[in-house]
Regions:
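Glycine-rich phosphate-binding active-site loops on the catalytic face of alpha/beta enzymes
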Residues: 39-45, 137-145, 178-204
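Conserved catalytic cores of soluble enzyme domains
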Residues: 154-156, 160-162, 182-184, 191-221
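A generic structured-segment signal
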Residues: 164-167, 177
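Glycine-rich adenosine-cofactor-binding loop
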Residues: 168-172
């Protein structure tokens, strides 16, 4: 038991990342039923589709689950309203200023964690009053911060900059990686790609097979001129 498991009411300090196109109700409920924290990825869902996934997830598990919400999305007001209406108790926010919604969510009894790519942003999260911070290094899939700080450099930097409960993310997919993150000061981990390749994930079977066939040196960057987006992970073969 630590601050992360106590905060979210979970057995293990493992959070399944809320990935677009991958993290629907089947994956989130499976992770929650296994003792972790499953997250629905709202970023790829129409607001009413999100409502449907929340209801199906609640029917599939009686354990805590949450929703990951990128704050930059144009339908953010409608998404937040649905989250509140459906009684979601945990929200992970990213891609925006946590001050914009943290107070509103807290007023409705919702726990808030925010994803950051630097210790500077972690301090802003503490000022905004979030309940936990996710330190996401450049190894993470999806859209990352422009700092390009690697996960195991970022963890101690954020740990030294804030007193918030700390979740590490980015390139973590094995027990050894979880242990290393904890040694550096994390109290929990957020894992994405590893869960994206499970049967419960809604990712394309072709994508899953592709990732499972990768080896050392196969990590690739796509669309970097638009946004830092590393894909394809070598640690999955460990």
């Amino acid at each position: 038991m630590n601050r992360i498991t106590s905060l979210f009411g979970i057995q293990y300090p493992i959070i399944q990342g809320g990935m677009v196109w991958c993290s629907g109700w089947r994956l989130a409920s499976a992770v929650s039923n296994a003792g972790g924290l499953g997250l629905l990825g709202a970023g790829s869902m129409h607001p009413e589709t999100l409502r449907e996934h929340i209801r199906k997830c609640r029917a599939a598990t009686d354990r805590p689950f949450g929703v990951n919400i990128p704050l930059m999305y144009p339908q953010i007001e409608e998404i937040m309203a649905i989250v509140a209406e459906e009684g979601v108790k945990i929200v992970f926010t990213s891609a925006g200023n946590p001050k914009a919604w943290t107070g509103w969510l807290h007023e409705r009894g919702i726990i808030v964690a925010h994803v950051v790519s630097s210790s500077r942003f972690a301090m802003k999260c503490e000022e905004a009053g979030v309940d936990a911070v996710v330190a996401e290094g450049f190894e993470a899939g999806g859209h990352n911060g422009r700092e390009e700080t690697t996960t195991f450099c970022l963890i101690p930097a954020v740990r030294n900059a804030t007193t918030l409960p700390l979740i590490a993310a980015g390139g973590i997919g094995t027990g050894e990686g979880i242990f290393a993150a904890m040694v550096l000061g994390a109290e929990g981990v957020q894992i994405g790609t590893r869960f994206a390749l499970t049967d419960e994930s809604s990712a394309s079977p072709v994508f899953k097979e592709y990732c499972l066939g990768l080896g050392e040196g196969d990590t690739k960057l796509l669309l970097k001129k638009l946004a830092p987006t590393p894909v394809s992970y070598t640690h999955l073969r460990a």
